[in-house]
Amino acid sequence: MEESAMTYENQKAWREIQTFLPKEYQYNADYKPTEEYWNWKGNNVHLDTFRNPDAKAKVICFHGVGTNGRQISMIIGGPLAKNGFETIMVDMPTYGMTEANPKMRITYADWVQCGSSLVDEELKKDVRPIFLYGLSAGGMEVYHVAAKNKNVKGIIGMTFLDQREKQVRMTTASNTFWGIAGALLAKLSCAIGFGGFKIKMSIPSKMKTLVNDRECLKIMMADSTSAGNKVTMQFLQSYVTYVPDIEPEDFSVCPILLTQPERDGWTPQFLSDSFLDKNKKVPVTKT
């Protein structure tokens, strides 16, 4: 670990969050991920990892716009590792413990490229199959990464939200104004030179439904590395207009699995259905 690198070792938020999880999901001295760092275009990208050279497959896990890599490592990365997989949880630039390159204005397109480059990096190490898992908005991100990279064996998403669709924006936005005008406002801000203006992601998005426990939500909303994070208008513009390298009608890279939460108050399944039902060339499983 680099001496000056940011680390979860002393971060308070995730430790408070894990108290809301069952005991077997909580980290301790004997059960916790290793923190790694990977340089991508001058971004010191933080990875939580459970390395296992005997694992037959790797799973790279992606957070959404209200979480970070440590949070998903607790609920999915660690449990998958216990079941014999090698898991890698990435903090995308501006989230978690990743130190963003100050010379870059990070966009959602950068997230997709970063994810694709991480797949390439892992494939350089060995030829074991790689699967992608995405939490919340990370579900659509893993589709975008797979469409760009084309070298993954399967994608798993909690949701698959195509923000280009008006119904998706209206349902997942914090209110009607942001649902109707958010994309236009972001575009206008970029056009007049305010693309670097930052707002909390909780302003345009329905972050109040991120988790169902009110006390846990307070902790996450106060955490500037996850639900309390700020993004630029340029990131927001890129997020709601991103065009995948392969549209769903032509996607033939790998099977898709939807793991829809039963009590999801933010992203109902019909939003994912509208996207997944367009995928006819690969097996699509919904749970």
Residue positions per predicted region:
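The serine-hydrolase catalytic nucleophile loop
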Residues: 65-77, 270
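Short beta-strand/loop motif that positions the catalytic acidic residue
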Residues: 252, 258-260, 264
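Conserved alpha/beta-hydrolase
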Residues: 79-100
